[in-house]
Amino acid sequence: MKTFCHFSLRLARRLPLLLLPAILLLLITTPPLAAMTLEEAMDALGEAKAQGQLGEQPDGYLGVVEDNSRAETIARLINEARREEYRRVARDNNIDLRDVELLAGQKAIERTPAGQYIRMPDGRWRRK
């Protein structure tokens, strides 16, 4: 029994070293998960909205209606781009950023087709 335990402890100590080649092989041969680009997010936006995953909000930004990582990534990338554009418009026109966001939100909600989600002022989502 002592021999078996001693052997097991030695193997347990060496196991990470024995697995290292297999782990390295996996790292080398597995392609990395590519991060979504803004262009890909913009291409995926229409489908995500049509599927009820994303919707327009009064603050000018996209909101996640149905939690999933893809929808969250699309919203994050597009919202970052929107925020940059809103800042530029506010700066160029010497107006408050919040005013630009609210106007953009109003226009986005007006342009949202029937059947897609919009966020109500009370925070609830509803189909337009």
Ranges and model annotations:
Residues 5-6, 26, 31-32:
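Intrinsically disordered, low-complexity repeat segments enriched in small/polar residues
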Residues 10, 20, 32-33, 88:
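N-terminal cationic amphipathic segment used for targeting or macromolecule association
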Residues 2, 34-128:
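Anionic, Ser/Thr-rich low-complexity intrinsically disordered regions
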Residues 1-11:
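N-terminal secretory signal peptides that target proteins for export/translocation
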Residues 14-15, 83:
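Hydrophobic alpha-helical segments, especially transmembrane helices
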Residues 16-29:
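Bacterial N-terminal signal peptides
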